[in-house]
Amino acid sequence: MASPFSGALQLTDLDDFIGPSQNCIKPVKVAKKPGSGIAKIHIEDDGSYFQVNQDGRTQKLEKAKVSLNDCLACSGCVTSAETVLITQQSHEELRKVLDANKEAAPGQQRLVVVSISPQSRASLAARFRLDPTDTARKLTSFFKKIGVHFVFDTAFARNFSLLESQKEFVQRFREQANSREALPVLASACPGWICYAEKTHGNFILPYISTARSPQQVMGSLVKDFFAQQQLLTPDKIYHVTVMPCYDKKLEASRPDFFNQEYQTRDVDCVLTTGEVFRLLEEEGVSLTELEPAPLDGLTSSVSAEEPSSHRGGGSGGYLEHVFRHAAQELFGIHVAEVTYQPLRNKDFQEVTLEREGQVLLRFAVAYGFRNIQNLVQKLKRGRCPYHYVEVMACPSGCLNGGGQLKAPDTEGSELLQQLERLYSMVRTEAPEDAPGVQELYQHWLQGEDSERASRLLHTQYHAVEKPSSGLSIRW
């Protein structure tokens, strides 16, 4: 069975494939008993484990059931988390919440919010042969038809992610003389890359990674904090679903960093991939083409609900382009009209430079796919990384090619990707600093751009995962 997770997440110290299962077998600490402690492990035909002592006595060893958080804290393969993910974060869970709302007494319902990514919207637009704006309106119509209360666009949250990434880079560039780990800055929006970095390279790589939250998790802050306040609700009274182009986003939403201890709720309760939304449509017997469009929802009255918006710089969010333009202007007073990409090893590794009088002032790169990520990390370890900033994504070709996107059976992969890029770029673009509602929220919700509150709600932290010494680390 092929894993839907990104290549970076399928890495493991085992050479054989561990298929997903409900009960992952994890080493369990057993209290030492007096004696020599010499024993053998016998594996039965049914897969159960027995300890065989020297005197011939046998003892069945424990089989530990692990949660998704256990899997995230493990240093090995994460494919065994797949079934847990599918049961905890699936369209069936959304159905349960919607059904519970129908049965609930007045005032006991949870407010259901769905936030849709631009990449998922482009994928569904391609499948149903619609333009992105019609797709957004018809998706709003569909979700409200099945009981969802509000449908938002995560592009609004991406404004904050981009702005925080811009500010962080400029700050770290200015600090590079005082810190060896200030540069390069590595983008943080891809959870597959983050999970791989934490598990495989740990404390070496983590200081380089941007602390800016991804658009999904900024949306989590917006919905469970700002929007909850607007609706006079506590965060646990809102059920927040995101629609994303990859399965790795389920792992991101499940991180303890994005869990509200006071209200015992996650910023994002459920992540659906584009494919899961398509299955939901099929199960409801609905085609997007047949639905009447509905008005789009805006998080604030100043956010346009007429049409969706996006950003320049490609289908992975435009991190390189926005940080590059801002840094050129802020650090060197240079206005960049067009960003020119120079392909290097392959189309997924490209470079951008800012030069003045023959001197390179800034050198940025995009590194998509695990092969290029490995090369980047090796350069860093050898002290030969020439870049100031790198937009890193685990999926080859970036987020439009995420593992949760719809595949076209009659279309070549490259042809479908070109179609998605065209649809993605059809949407109106805006600079994040000029987006309606953004500055208003910085002042009134976050209490200023550089406030402690802005840092807490728009940034995160990373955790190196220690590799335990166990039999599971044996290479076969």
Curated annotation (Swiss-Prot):
GO cellular component, as recorded: cytosolic [4Fe-4S] assembly targeting complex
Keywords for the protein's UniProt record, in alphabetical order: 4Fe-4S, Acetylation, Iron, Iron-sulfur, Metal-binding
BP GO annotations: hematopoietic progenitor cell differentiation; intracellular oxygen homeostasis; iron-sulfur cluster assembly; regulation of gene expression; response to hypoxia
SUPFAM superfamilies cross-referenced by the UniProt entry: Fe-only hydrogenase (SSF53920)
Annotated segments matching region Disordered: 297-316
MF-aspect GO terms: 4 iron, 4 sulfur cluster binding; metal ion binding
SMART domains according to UniProt: Fe_hyd_SSU
Positions of transmembrane segments: none
InterPro entries: Cytosolic_Fe-S_CAF, Fe_hydrogenase, Fe_hydrogenase_lsu_C, Fe_hydrogenase_ssu
Metal-binding recorded as keyword: yes
Binding site for [4Fe-4S] cluster 2: C190, C246, C395, C399
Assembly, per entry: External component of the CIA complex. In the CIA complex, interacts directly with CIAO1 and MMS19.
Record function comment: Component of the cytosolic iron-sulfur protein assembly (CIA) complex, a multiprotein complex that mediates the incorporation of iron-sulfur cluster into extramitochondrial Fe/S proteins. Seems to negatively regulate the level of HIF1A expression, although this effect could be indirect.
Entry-linked PANTHER family: NITRATE, FORMATE, IRON DEHYDROGENASE
Protein's UniProt name: Cytosolic iron-sulfur assembly component 3
Organism of origin: Mus musculus (Mouse)
Source organism phylogeny: Eukaryota, Metazoa, Chordata, Craniata, Vertebrata
Gene: Ciao3
